[in-house]
């Protein structure tokens, strides 16, 4: 039999995918709610790509959502680097929405486009810990500014360097060693 190729669908997954059949247990309302969340995530992915391109080009925004415009315009004004990968190991890395390290200050901005759940600073603290590990910087020797852009506002936070160091050593480094031991056992 000659099966249909569907080249355009390679490396993609349908919402009603056989590989994640949880949806077969949904009622109609749960299906609709789940699909709306999926659509919001897809839109968020596209908005992040759009914002990264605008920042890279230095194109300030007007006429878009207040949250998106604030995030892009602040990132441009503060010379942030969009979509930067922060790497500790194959088991622990992430992609910061916007980051800058100048004048001994680490700034990390995060754009949240979701509808319901407020963003958490813990994610940005992990990015700060990854930055310090990757570039061999003691968090006590720098200033750290974290910002979440969501719900038409920017929430700013300066984490305690001890919290960042604890994340670095007690979580990232220790957990990475544990996972390496698990890999070696197999």
PLM regions: where:
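Mg2+/Mn2+-dependent nuclease catalytic core
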Residues: 84-177
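Metal-dependent nuclease catalytic cores that hydrolyze phosphodiester bonds in DNA/RNA
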Residues: 1-95, 101
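Accessory terminal regions of nucleic-acid processing enzymes
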Residues: 176-186
């Amino acid at each position: 039999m000659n099966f249909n190729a569907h080249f355009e669908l390679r490396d993609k997954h349908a919402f009603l995918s056989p590989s994640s059949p949880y949806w077969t247990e949904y009622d109609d309302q749960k299906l609709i709610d789940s699909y709306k969340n999926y659509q919001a995530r897809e839109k968020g992915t596209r908005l992040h790509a759009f914002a990264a391109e605008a920042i890279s080009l230095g194109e300030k925004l007007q006429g878009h959502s207040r949250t998106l415009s604030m995030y892009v315009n602040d990132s441009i004004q503060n010379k942030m680097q969009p979509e930067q990968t922060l790497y500790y190991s194959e088991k622990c890395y992430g992609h910061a929405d916007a980051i800058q390290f100048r004048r001994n200050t680490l700034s990390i901005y995060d754009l949240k486009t979701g509808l319901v759940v407020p963003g958490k600073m813990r994610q940005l603290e992990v990015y700060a810990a990854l930055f310090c590990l990757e570039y061999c910087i003691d968090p006590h020797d720098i200033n750290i500014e974290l910002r979440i852009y969501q719900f038409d506002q920017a929430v700013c936070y300066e984490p305690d360097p001890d919290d960042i160091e604890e994340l670095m050593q007690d979580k990232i480094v220790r957990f990475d060693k544990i996972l390496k031991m698990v890999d070696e056992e197999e």
